[in-house]
């Protein structure tokens, strides 16, 4: 499941347990919400255990949104997920910002957009 809210001028998208949600569907949901709220920066929040399918969906959503020039960040306490996200984003040319904490991600996105 994907929930969203606006916090301090930042679109915060929270990915929760979504058994059966396909990677492409999640990528489409994330990218559609980012496009609808363009030019608002976005933070995708992931949990402590992040399945590979969710990582792939976030990277795919980021790829879909690159042309719009919207700042997209990811926040997850999972160090392995952060490393994987950074490596996959770097392979696509970089630009995806990855944080360990949600509050840091939101503050940084807000400050960068200002």
Could you say what each language-model-derived stretch is?
Residues 57:
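Internal alpha/beta domain cores that form substrate/cofactor-binding pockets in large enzymes
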């Amino acid at each position: 499941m994907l929930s969203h809210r606006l916090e301090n001028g930042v679109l915060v998208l929270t990915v929760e347990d979504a058994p059966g949600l396909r990677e492409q569907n999640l990528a489409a949901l994330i990218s559609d919400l980012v496009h609808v709220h363009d030019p608002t920066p976005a933070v995708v929040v992931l949990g402590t255990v992040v399945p590979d399918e969710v990582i792939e969906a976030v990277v795919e959503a980021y790829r879909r949104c690159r042309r719009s020039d919207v700042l997209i960040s990811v926040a997850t306490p999972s160090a392995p997920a952060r490393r994987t996200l950074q490596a996959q984003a770097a392979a696509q040319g970089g630009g995806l910002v990855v944080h360990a904490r949600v509050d840091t991600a939101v503050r940084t996105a807000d400050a960068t957009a200002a």
